[in-house]
Amino acid sequence: DKNKVESLPEELRHIFFDMCVNQGKSRGVKILQRAANAKGAGLKVDGGLGPKTIAAISESNVELDRVRAYRVKYYADLVTRKPDLEKFYFGWYKRALEV
């Protein structure tokens, strides 16, 4: 498992895999790290899925809805930086909430 999907809590595996495919592994990990930090994990947001990140995500009980919210924020920030991508935002938003 190149992306270490199996090392994550079961309820986050599908969305993490989808983030790896659509946003790249590093960005997907950063979203998980930010979601864990919102619950007090204190992780460095570096995009690396090492033992500290895996443990913190499990121990902080990161909820799927929290990950979805951070994923939506990523897309909103991307469109703010690159307004020409706004035409894709609604589809990205829907996907972020449905996966």
For the regions a language model picked out, list residue spans one by one:
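Low-complexity, Gly/Ser/Thr/Pro-rich intrinsically disordered linker/tail segments
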Residues: 60-99
